[in-house]
């Protein structure tokens, strides 16, 4: 079995794979101040609850966009698992050809998503990840990572609205029947949800055109991340949701580098 960790700005997602099957996964809050032992205690509890043992784990791979947390996580893995983890970054084989001006600028999470999507779908792709930031990535059928777009995420955009507009209440992000709303709460909800759905459709439309102008077939659009389901219900562009895309990518990269 292998342990995979996707370290994001808001959450750390952990998964356990037995062969190619995801048998358990959890989500922890990202906290730069936690020590290796504090993370170790959390992982012990998660393993215990699922009747898993640290000795079952043969390898570990980590993808992170939070450099400050890596010392604690690597130390935790070393101390509790006695394993040196694979860290997604320069020198790690991914099978993806990064066409960015500076490939080192591409976030590990975006690379991992590209690896998974290419492995699963084998076609031109637009990958949308609704995380702390919302990212759009263009990948060709030949596994060339062309680039993409980064937008403020739904939660941080909403938080900024609530923090800066004193009279606007915080609201639950749920769909409204339409956009002509009769109260402030519904007006905010519709603005956020339909606004982001429109953003998705517009960016995907432009990205598809640019990819097809390069000779690609019409790209398949896959979405992942916490708000993927909510936005996909209103977006006309998303073909499929894959909630474990990043974990799958980590598994594939581990297999390429073990």
UniProtKB/Swiss-Prot annotation:
Active site: 109
Keywords: ATP-binding, Coenzyme A biosynthesis, Cytoplasm, Kinase, Metal-binding, Nucleotide-binding, Potassium, Transferase
Amino acids binding substrate: 100, 107-110, 184
Subcellular location per the Swiss-Prot or TrEMBL entry: Cytoplasm
A GO biological-process term: coenzyme A biosynthetic process
Catalytic activity of the protein: (R)-pantothenate + ATP = (R)-4'-phosphopantothenate + ADP + H(+)
Enzyme Commission number: 2.7.1.33
GO cellular component, one term: cytoplasm
Major site of localization recorded for this protein: cytoplasm
Cofactor: NH4(+); K(+)
Top EC class, one word: transferase
Cofactor-binding details, from the entry: A monovalent cation. Ammonium or potassium.
GO molecular function, one term: ATP binding
Pathway: Cofactor biosynthesis; coenzyme A biosynthesis; CoA from (R)-pantothenate: step 1/5
Residues at which ATP binds: 6-13, 132
Superkingdom of the organism of origin: Bacteria
CDD domains to which the protein is assigned, alphabetical: ASKHA_NBD_PanK-III
Residues that bind K(+): 129
PANTHER family: TYPE III PANTOTHENATE KINASE
Task of the protein: Catalyzes the phosphorylation of pantothenate (Pan), the first step in CoA biosynthesis.
Subunit structure: Homodimer.
Family stated for the protein in its record: Belongs to the type III pantothenate kinase family.
HAMAP family according to UniProt: Pantothen_kinase_3
Protein name, as recorded: Type III pantothenate kinase
Phylogenetic lineage: Bacteria, Bacillati, Bacillota, Clostridia, Eubacteriales
